[in-house]
Design a protein with these regions (language model features):
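Structural preference for beta-strand elements that scaffold enzyme active sites
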Residues: 18-20, 68-70, 97
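Auxiliary Fe-S-binding modules of radical SAM enzymes
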Residues: 86-93, 103-249
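A short acidic, helix-capping loop that chelates divalent metal ions and anchors anionic groups
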Residues: 5, 27-35, 107-111, 192-194
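Short glycine-enriched, charge-decorated loop/helix-capping segments at active-site entrances
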Residues: 32-44, 112-115
């Protein structure tokens, strides 16, 4: 969904405190290639709307200086690795934290293969060669390692779910629009919460169901993926999974 000015104001008024927008390139061809659009013109149109959305979010009160507005980019080796520096430059100009995401095998339809993963360390090295960086670290239960530009140009973050899994302290639980709870982004199935929501809400039962789900979770998909080919880097996907469009990021 592209963010318009009115929607941004409505979300802010409703109590939303932060927004992350996604952009995988800074030219029409790159955007089209990564989004599966018809051509450079279609990609350029989407790029224009994303740049406008950044302005709408800022005007609505989502302040990037307070971490309320960030920019995500998924990077693949042959798809948009050439966009690393342009994306970093755009984020620096806009005062946004750029969050680079390793290409992940979420779902079953994105054509994921290990060879297309551009490791976080390589992404950081490429950007750091242009604008020197110093590490900030990864917050407890956080998904991204963070770096600070030494020239004061803001921060860079990288989600290294493939090459540096963080399953051990992950505390993410996702609930889909149709009421199913997933305790891992890479899960194949979840727990249906609707029995505690319909025909009337059972708050105590819902709380107990969520507590039981969390205490019983054994999710460590990213760690298990690496164990398939120990010492050889990224392993192959393990099993079918729910699609990202269904789960959310």
């Amino acid at each position: 969904m592209l963010l318009g000015a009115e929607r941004a104001r409505q979300l802010k008024a409703a109590g939303l405190d932060r927004i992350t927008l996604s952009l995988d390139g800074t030219d029409g061809a790159s955007v089209a290639r990564m989004a599966g659009l018809g051509g450079a013109a279609a990609g350029a149109a989407v790029l224009e709307k994303v740049l406008a959305a950044i302005g709408h979010a800022r005007e609505a009160g989502f302040d990037p200086a307070r971490g309320a507005l960030k920019l995500n980019a998924v990077v693949t080796r042959s798809g948009n690795a050439d966009q690393l520096l342009p994306l970093a430059e755009l984020a620096r100009e806009q005062g946004l934290e750029l969050r680079l995401i390793e290409f992940m095998d979420v779902g079953n339809r994105n054509g994921w293969v290990p060879e297309q993963v551009l490791p976080a360390a390589e992404m950081v090295a490429r950007i750091g060669a242009a604008w020197p960086l110093e590490p900030v670290g990864r917050a407890p239960h956080g998904t991204a390692g963070r770096w600070r530009y030494r020239d004061g140009g803001g921060h860079l973050a990288v989600v290294a779910s493939i090459t540096a899994p963080f399953c051990g302290d992950c505390n993410r639980l996702r609930i889909t629009a149709d009421g199913v709870a997933y305790s891992c982004l890479f899960a194949a199935d979840g727990t249906d919460l609707k029995p505690w929501l319909r025909p009337c809400a059972d708050a105590a039962g819902l709380e107990e169901a969520l507590r039981r789900l969390w205490l019983q979770r054994r999710d460590r998909y990213s760690e298990e993926r690496q164990m398939i080919r120990p010492g050889e880097g990224v392993g192959a996907p393990l099993r079918p999974q729910a699609e990202m469009a269904y789960l959310g990021g």
